[in-house]
């Protein structure tokens, strides 16, 4: 049986649709279930529903054979997992944003983000020394209350930035969801994993 860690939320719905297109029979009530672990005996699969940031942890520690994780999570945390496939769902991008017309503080510039490693690496590559302030939510609030000069966050439609009076200043990287696998699981269950990869690759949107 393959155990697959899936992120809750919007990505979950898109991933389910992709699995169904690939020919996997999943019960209609699957998307509405409040269970955190669901077995589908007909497909010899078990699904674990988790927070997006936790999916990689489950796969790395082997409690899940595979997982679906955003490229942003993969970039932020170096983990002992293999990236098998770009599923090309949940498309968005990482960006630097701030208040329009407001320059960075030249003495002690601060950047708020839930991606401290990505932000540190990006500004270092730009030759800028900044203080990184880690936040777990409502990142857009930071420039409005003077906590930070800039933010680094995921941007999808840009609506949240606009509604909070912020503008995108620099694009860092495109982000999509990826299929990842535990290295040991890949060796032990290679046939099942390869079949999943093949079937998904046939229906991935271009």
Curated annotation (Swiss-Prot):
GO molecular function, one term: ATP binding
Location in or out of the cell: Cytoplasm
Coiled-coil region list: none
Stored CDD domains: PBP2_HisGs (cd13595)
Claim: Transmembrane helix is one of the keywords in the record: no
Keyword DNA damage among UniProt keywords: no
Gene3D superfamilies: Periplasmic binding protein-like II
Name the record gives this protein: ATP phosphoribosyltransferase
Organism placement in taxonomy: Bacteria, Bacillati, Bacillota, Bacilli, Bacillales
């Amino acid at each position: 049986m393959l155990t697959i860690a899936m992120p809750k939320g919007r990505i979950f719905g898109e991933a389910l649709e992709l699995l169904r297109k690939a020919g996997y029979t999943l019960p209609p009530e699957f998307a509405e279930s409040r269970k955190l672990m669901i077995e589908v005996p007909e497909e010899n699969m078990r699904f674990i529903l988790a927070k997006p940031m936790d999916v990689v942890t489950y796969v790395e520690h082997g409690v899940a054979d595979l997982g679906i994780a955003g490229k942003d999570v993969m970039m932020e945390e170096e983990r002992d997992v293999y990236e098998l496939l770009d599923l090309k769902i949940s498309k968005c991008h990482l960006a630097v944003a701030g208040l329009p017309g407001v320059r960075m503080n030249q003495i002690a510039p601060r950047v708020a983000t839930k991606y401290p490693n990505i932000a540190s690496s990006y500004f270092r590559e730009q030759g800028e020394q900044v203080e990184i302030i880690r936040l777990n939510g409502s990142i857009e609030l930071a420039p409005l209350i003077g906590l930070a000069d800039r933010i680094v966050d995921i941007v999808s439609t840009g609506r949240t930035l606009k509604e909070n009076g912020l503008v995108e200043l620099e694009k860092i990287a495109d982000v999509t969801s990826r299929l990842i696998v535990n290295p040991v699981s890949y060796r032990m269950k290679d046939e099942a994993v390869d079949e999943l990869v093949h079937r998904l690759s046939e229906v991935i949107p271009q």
